[in-house]
Amino acid sequence: MRILLSNDDGYLAPGLAALSDALQPLAELTVIAPEQNCSGASNSLTLSRPLSVQRAASTGFFYVNGTPTDSVHVALTGMADARPDLVVSGINNGQNMGEDTLYSGTVAAATEGIMFGVPAIAFSLVDKGWAHLPDAARVAAEIVKHYLAHPLPGQPLLNVNIPNLPYDELKGWKVTRLGKRHPSQPVIRQTDPRGEPIYWIGAAGEALDASDGTDFHAVANGFVSITPLQLDLTHTQMLPATREWARAGGRAS
């Protein structure tokens, strides 16, 4: 079995190293990640300049002067000697729940695998900090091992959020749907040394829908949240109303 591992925190991130160590016994592992932290990069590709791939002497990890999506794209379309059986992304420093998934470079790296027909799993550690990173890596390896032995049908994309707790305090796995956040905090305006205004993106909003069954609810109650995602963004329930709206405009066929 072959696994392609990436992340969005960069090739020097502790989460990547911990997950690499945990996955080594399970499969032939190739690690390729961004050179720099790319949190919030989403599914962006670098199209305005060429990309270079280097290899770290200390770890053997490949790193790209681009985004998480660039990293997986390069590996799958031009660098990898053989097609992987699974793309894994993480472990991210902080959760990716609800609308976070649209901004997340961690989820984006996994999504790029799905774009090329390779199943993928994204792992994130809830709350900033690595206090229980070894425990999270152990959980991630258990999930990957189970997937390799019992794969889901099709090309699944799983988004996994692991509470930042000791392993023995985790209550197990729970399959969830995405919750919803309040809008993010306003931008923070400051002034640069030349007197020009600059802006920092504000913090993410708190949970709005953290009801039972959501990723927010699961991790708040000590469960590992596993959310199956899909690339089709079509709002199918809105199709009939949208057709009627278009007909009323006199242009629908």
Swiss-Prot record:
Subcellular localization, as worded in the UniProt entry: Cytoplasm
Cofactor(s) recorded in Swiss-Prot or TrEMBL:
a divalent metal cation
Where it mainly occurs, coarsely classed, is cytoplasm
InterPro entries under this entry?
Answer: SurE (IPR030048), SurE-like_Pase/nucleotidase (IPR002828), SurE-like_sf (IPR036523)
The reaction(s) annotated as catalysed by this protein in its Swiss-Prot or TrEMBL entry are:
a ribonucleoside 5'-phosphate + H2O = a ribonucleoside + phosphate
Membrane-spanning parts: none
Single GO molecular function: exopolyphosphatase activity
Q: What Pfam families does UniProt report for this protein, alphabetically?
A: SurE
User: Is Nucleotide-binding one of the keywords?
Assistant: yes
What note does UniProt attach to the cofactor annotation? Binds 1 divalent metal cation per subunit.
Can you tell me which residues bind a divalent metal cation?
8-9, 39, 92
Keywords annotated in UniProt: Cytoplasm, Hydrolase, Metal-binding, Nucleotide-binding
Enzyme Commission no: 3.1.3.5
In terms of domain of life, where is this protein from?
Bacteria
Annotated GO CC locations: cytoplasm
Per its UniProt record, what PANTHER family does this chain match? 5'-NUCLEOTIDASE SURE, 5'_3'-NUCLEOTIDASE SURE
Q: What is known about what this protein does? A: Nucleotidase that shows phosphatase activity on nucleoside 5'-monophosphates.
What's this protein's family per the entry?
Belongs to the SurE nucleotidase family.
Give the protein's recorded name. Answer: 5'-nucleotidase SurE 2
Gene name as annotated: surE2
